[in-house]
Amino acid sequence: MKKITNKPTKTDETTLGLRGLCAKRASTICYMIQQAKEHGVQDGAAFAREAITKYGEDIGQVVKSKMKNPDDLLEFSQYFGAGADRDIYEMEVVAQDEDRFYLDFHYCPYVAEWQKMGRDPEEMAELCDIAMEGDRAVGASFEAFAFTLGETIAQGCPVCQIRFDKVKK
């Protein structure tokens, strides 16, 4: 596995505070899986995936309810990864049109927290994949486009590749 590089460039007080909240979520996910196993849940990771999927479904429905046209990828791009999230994850909009909405995350507070917790690279890659169930579920809330997770910081790549593509009918 590649060496993980995850260095923030945005360090204003608000962004750092919001990243702290993300770090709490990251450690909670990690500990929930660990505790589920200790309490006899055979597959703590599956348990966490299902819970995070439900969370993502809820977010997807909220976003959908705000949109005038839930088939419009440009309108969706005004809600997903908007606001403070852009700074928290140091997002770069790689493509944004009626057929594609591509984001690259240049920083991940989840990975930073898992590194502080001493998690090994393989576990971080799995934890990342579990955490991304939320975004997968957001994407699945929309029939007109599909979500794809490309490479991730947790895998040792320089960015997390978040991709939404219009589904051709």
Labelled PLM ranges:
Residues 126-139:
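A conserved amphipathic terminal alpha-helix motif
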Residues 1-129, 145-169:
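N-terminal accessory segment detector
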